[in-house]
Amino acid sequence: MKTYDFIGIGIGPFNLSIAALAEGLDGFSSLFLERKPHFSWHPGMMVPDCHMQTSFLKDLVSAVEPTNRHSFLNYLVQRKKFYRFLTTEQRTVSREEFADYLCWAADNLTNLAFSQQVQQVSFDEQNGLFEVVTQRDRFLARHVCVGIGKQINLPDCVTAQDDTCFHASEMMLRTPDLAGKRVTVVGGGQSG
């Protein structure tokens, strides 16, 4: 069984960033495990014409290594969007564009493994290694980073979710008829 220097559990933007930065390190082995079959970033919140609240320079790698091949600017070049982006003088990008960038980066990384549901993590004090067990494999690692994201939090008064009551993370996956109806948003941040 191969021993990795680093195993990441969950592949969201945080661990995707670590994967992109770790990929180019000589003599450093890393593996990132995700239960989903492919990368996706908030698919239920891809509201048309909704823009990021942060600069595109806060991508996966630019703050640490601006010349990394997984930068947002390189994504624009590879997708033949760079000159269009330059001429529009955008300071922020749409959530859909940023999601496409993240998928592009995930598609270009070789240290990601999808459809790998982590079932157990244990630490062997004797050899100083973590053992990470999935439904199909076992891995050993010197270091582990858990980046599984947040779980939705609904008030106790919400007993069922349907097209009349749901979490904002599912907004674009549902098709409620809101015409002429009153809508209440509970919470804030990205959804409020």
Where are these regions (language model features)?
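Glycine-rich FAD pyrophosphate-binding loop
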Residues: 7-9, 19-46
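Short hydrophobic core segments
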Residues: 7-9, 118, 132, 138-152, ...
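Glycine-rich nucleotide phosphate-binding loop and flanking beta-alpha elements
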Residues: 15, 39, 120, 151-152, ...
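Glycine-rich dinucleotide-binding loop and its adjacent helix/turn
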Residues: 94, 148-192
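Helical element adjacent to the flavin cofactor pocket in flavoenzyme catalytic cores
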Residues: 95-113, 118, 147-152
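A conserved short coil-to-beta-strand element within the FAD-binding core of flavoproteins
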Residues: 114-130
